[in-house]
A protein has these predicted regions:
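Functional transmembrane alpha-helices
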Residues: 1-135
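Cytoplasmic/organellar membrane-interface segments at the starts of transmembrane helices
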Residues: 59, 115-182
């Protein structure tokens, strides 16, 4: 979300469009990640990472879906998060390369933590917890994940659907903001 703040404070049309797009993407990705955490809790009945491990062995479909959303969280190419952050950085590079450098360090740190978390949940040693192994991913969960994945990749592969709606309104917002500053 730091990229959103950087996109908003520059008063640049490209950055504002990227920030709004990133907010939309963040709503999809964070909602999906919270839904994944709910799915974990439904199966493991624990909330602490130290008790989770070996999820890939017991629930491979659910852990693969979780991987896709974790990669979207770190702005993997092809996802909507990548488009939003890429557009913000395109506009930001004209304003301040120092801010781009600091934000890039933050993105790298976030990616390391995200991948470490996924590795710990999916591939660590299997913990001896009482697990009800009914289904890997039940039908209702699968349909919700399918809808979230559809929008994640739709906006990642065809971002003009949203950007065409944003062009004029972002231009108007920037013009009003510049008048307020003067």
């Amino acid at each position: 979300m730091n990229a959103v703040v950087l996109g908003l404070i520059t008063l640049n049309k490209i950055n504002l469009e990227g920030a709004i797009f990133q907010m939309l993407s963040h709503g999809i990705v964070s909602g999906a990640l919270f839904f994944c955490v709910g799915s974990f809790y439904k199966r493991y009945k624990v909330r602490s990472l130290k008790y989770l491990g070996g999820f890939m062995q017991t629930y491979p479909i659910l852990s693969t879906i979780f991987l896709i959303f974790m990669l979207a969280n770190i702005s993997f190419p092809g996802t909507s998060s990548f488009v939003g952050e890429f557009v913000i950085f395109l506009g930001l590079i004209n304003n301040s390369t120092f801010l781009v450098f600091i934000a890039s360090l933050n993105m790298i740190t976030g990616a390391i933590y995200t991948l470490w978390t996924y590795n710990r949940i999916a591939f660590a040693n299997f913990k001896n917890l009482i697990i009800q192994k009914n289904f890997d991913c039940d039908r209702n969960e699968f349909y919700i994940y399918l809808i979230l994945l559809y929008f994640l990749f739709l906006l990642g592969l065809f971002p003009n659907v949203v950007f065409e709606l944003l062009h004029m309104s972002c231009f108007t917002i920037i013009e009003h903001a510049k008048l307020q500053i003067l």
